[in-house]
Amino acid sequence: IFTSGATEAAGLALNGRGIRCADIEHEAVSSWCQSDLSCGLDGGVACEAPEATALQLANSETGILQQLPEGLALCDMTQAFGKLPVAFHWTGATMALVSAHKIGGPKGVGALIVKRGTEVAAQIKGGGQEMGRRSGTENVIGIAGFGAAAEAAQRDLADGVWEQVEKLRNILEKAVAQSASETIFVGQGGRRLPNTSYMISEGWRGETQVMQMDLAGFSVSAGSACSSGKVKRSRVLHAMGFSAEQAACALRVSLGPQNKQEDIERFVEVWSAHQHRLQGRRRSA
């Protein structure tokens, strides 16, 4: 069912269903759910009733991957789609969300994927498009662009593009750890998206890091890409059990196929210089 994006698709899937989730889910999902499921420091969610649970395949903030139980009510594939070799039937879910702009396609188009025989009540009624489940003239150009982006994403996966991105991410984390050994990398050691590094450097506010790196030409954030620009504590890190101070000092770095090793080296050089100056001021205070 084509929609204006994953946010609309989430509402179409979840409205009136009484679904539960953990507070690490994207707000497009959690705002429709009862957010009472527990989550550990590893980002894993305890899911005892999958048929009444919404769960993301990859967290939009940390990049941590979930172990999906069979029969899940809704799988949010938005962040993982295009970066991992995934397919709807592989998730075992009844419904799933995807979005075009997350794979380099046009903004303003997404889809709700539904297992055959699943009832979906239309929220937009009128002309009966999308088999009566989402009325309104389809964004044909956007949908075509979505298809082209999906084909390109498949080629990138086949060519090992994201494996190279993962190598760069690991080089970045190793270099940062050598420069500042106390840095915490959220989800490191577990299964994560290949492009995401979420770093905590206690005593160095996330929004300060963002501004300093921005002045050096690096686009980073203190939260998920959808929430960048909003200065507030990460509810994802809070739900995982990190302290308020740790959550306030988090920096999210997201890499792409266009990045090269010299980008990583320059990033680490700039980040480490700021971090060392901060440590020096503390020692002299």
Residue ranges and their predicted role:
Residues 1-285:
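Pyridoxal 5′-phosphate
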